[in-house]
Amino acid sequence: MDIRGAVDAAVPTNIIAAKAAEVRANKVNWQSYLQGQMISGEDCEFIQRFEQKRSPEEKQELLQAEGSQCAKTFINLMTHISKEQTVQYILTMIDDMLQEKHQRVSIFFDYAKRGKNTAWSYFLPMLNRQDLFTVHMAARIIAKLAAWGKELMEGSDLNYYFNWIKTQLSSQKLRGTMGAIETGTVSTSDSSQYVQCVAGCLQLMLRVNEYRFAWVEADGVNCIMGVLSNKCGFQLQYQMIFSIWLLAFSPQMCEYLRRYNIVPVLSDILQESVKEKVTRIILAAFRNLLEKSTERETRQEYALAMIQCKILKQLENLDQQKYDDEDISEDIKFLLEKLGESVQDLSSFDEYSSELKSGRLEWSPVHKSEKFWRENAVRLNEKNYELLKVIEQLGGKQLVMNHMHHEDQQVRYNALLAVQKLMVHNWESLE
């Protein structure tokens, strides 16, 4: 699947779209703001002319001639008017304008440069407001400015925005009110749709390679994995896996992603998936991990993890089905071929190593083979004791000791034997 073909990241969720339609229908009486000296005559005159331009051609002509005035008016209105309904209206107009033509972000960059500001500096403070619609429209505009503009968001602004995204995704329960201010509550359904809006902002940001590195540095992968492990709805699931797919377009990111249990988590979701779009994005993510990795060892590690998680069997089952989307069939064919090649080169120790790294060991015959351990025990020390460190991280010693009281006699026996050998080894070291 090509990155250019994935266009739904900027599409608003149902609740955002419905509220935006409601906001557009409630026209603002700009004349009353002018009479109350809350806005200037210049801004009042321009916003009224802007509203009168119905066709895209008329609007484009106005923006080409008076782009600077447009940015100035929108920002003045947004910062000087406190009424929430009017702020919502202004943000919706800005979002619509940018969505119609992505290049229009330049009018905000040009205006900001004159005041030695950044284009998003006017919108970032709005992330702290109470109204959910206002907050998320501002978040969408920030993402569009950052993703579609010629200048990159950097430093404290980018850290602030990414931390806000992480907080929203991690909580999945956004505070504030939207429309139903009388009750002071937001339904679970509404809340989940706002989280999807946040995920959409992340999807848009991660299309830009530089932002992928910044997201990873902000510990963003842990945030994504946390959401996926939290049994979220299929739409948010899709968006988080979409984000992994975007990250995996970068070879360096493929290297970094080895630290996380991505393959087992996606494998579990694939097995339970009933939505074709979720299946499609998982297969595309798997393909990127194998195809974009430049290091042979990295590709091999991902392939082994997929084999260990029984992805081959799932692919064979999926291959029997018919799909409208050609990308799915192509990705299945690619993965079957690559994993088939890896199976040929797979040694028993490779399989054991892959199982251990995934935290999913299976009691297969090879694990009980004395010959296997005589030949391979020393290999646990390879790569600066990499596998021994994994065992330590998994709490291997404590797990073995827990099994000394296991109901199965064979398990108890092996656990006692292992603990005995550990103690003997420690005594010998002390001597």
What positions do the PLM features span?
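N-terminal "cap/leader" segments of large eukaryotic alpha-helical scaffolds
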Residues: 1-86, 99, 333-387
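Buried hydrophobic core positions in alpha-solenoid tandem helical repeats
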Residues: 73-76, 108, 119-125, 161-169, ...
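Short sequence/structural elements of tandem HEAT/ARM alpha-solenoid repeats
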Residues: 64-72, 106-118, 154-163, 213-219, ...
